[in-house]
Amino acid sequence: GTAYGILELSRMIGVSPWEWWADSPVEKKQSFKLKEGFKTLQYPSVARRGIFINDEDWGLTPWSYLTHEPSDTKGQIGPKTHARIFELLLRLRANTFWPAMHTCSVAFYLTPGNKETADKYGIFIGTAHCEPMMRNTNAEWKTAGTGKYDYVNNRENVLRFWEERVKELASSDNIYTLGIRGVHDGKMQGANTLQEQK
């Protein structure tokens, strides 16, 4: 709430939410006055408002790890980049973020500082349709999973994989994807018919 209040004043004095990302110039003013007793009370009509970073391979990923936040780790979008994204979200009155999740980028929670930056900015983190329980299976199952990513035939290991992340994020604001499908955009393994998939 405090951030939204301060950023509302920022908007009123002419600072664009895009001031950093789009190099939007800030109009200089000699003074700015609010009427005595000024009050504004605003409520969002939608509780969670945000963006999903998708198809990050051609723009955000190379810009982040090669230019804005140089890293020896190819595809890493780190906390410095996310801080800029989160500031923009707050300036746009948003509060939710679905991070990049393709093979060209390092999974959000595998980059030190990303979780803490989201917590600092009060941003809810969600995951895409193929990332149940905050796990980027595309990137993380290879290193943190055991056996095949197959809930039907490897249930205990899949549950353990999810449980580790849920415990890690217990104190953070998250939106959990509960459905299951295969790695990335593949079909769910071990279930070949609609009845088996239920």
Model-predicted regions and their roles:
Residues G1-V152, A170, N174:
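Feature activates predominantly on carbohydrate-active enzymes
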Residues I85, N114, F161, R165, ...:
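A general structural detector for well-ordered alpha-helical segments in enzyme core domains, enriched
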Residues V152-E163:
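Glycine-rich anion/phosphate-binding loops
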